[in-house]
Design a protein with these regions (language model features):
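Two-component/phosphorelay signaling modules centered on CheY-like receiver
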Residues: 17-35
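Acidic, metal-coordinating helix/loop segments flanking the phosphotransfer/catalytic sites
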Residues: 36-54, 58
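Short acidic active-site motifs
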Residues: 39-43, 65, 115
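Conserved phosphotransfer cores of two-component systems
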Residues: 48-50, 73-80
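Conserved phosphotransfer microenvironments
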Residues: 57-74, 89-93
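Hydrophobic/aromatic residues positioned on beta-strands within the core alpha/beta folds
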Residues: 85-87
Length: 127
């Protein structure tokens, strides 16, 4: 958990490198330790070797399945929280919360990065 390392540890899984780097920079400015991965294989590898307080996860990955990443994160690290982001209206009915018990938020990809960072900080403190 964040108390062990002293910094919040965030895994960002986003297929769009520009968007992922934008989020990463905002979180780093808030003294969060971040790792950016573009797809399922990189995210799974990261989760096998490190603990993360939060996973910010693009629901529609170009490489692999976001649900597989979320399931693995929940299995490997039951305290890890998931924030899904998407640029689609898929799951806009809120059903995403029933599919993964660690899901804490579901946001549009165009959410201002400072708002996403504030949500990450909020849910990390809640752990």
């Amino acid at each position: 958990m964040c108390l062990v390392w002293g910094k919040m540890r965030i895994l960002i899984v986003e297929s769009d490198p520009d968007l992922g780097q934008l989020w990463q920079r905002h979180m780093q400015r808030q003294d969060m330790e971040t790792r950016l991965e573009a797809g399922q294989s990189g995210a799974i590898c990261a989760l096998q070797t490190q603990y993360f307080d939060i996973v910010v996860l693009d629901l529609v990955l170009k490489q692999g399945s976001a649900m597989a990443v979320a399931d693995f994160a929940s299995y490997r690290h039951p305290d890890t929280q998931i924030i899904f982001v998407t640029n689609t209206s898929f799951f806009s009915d809120g059903s995403i919360f029933a599919l993964n018990a660690n899901t804490r938020a579901f946001l549009q990809s165009d959410t201002p990065p400072e708002d996403l960072t504030a949500m990450v900080a909020h849910y990390t403190r809640a752990v």
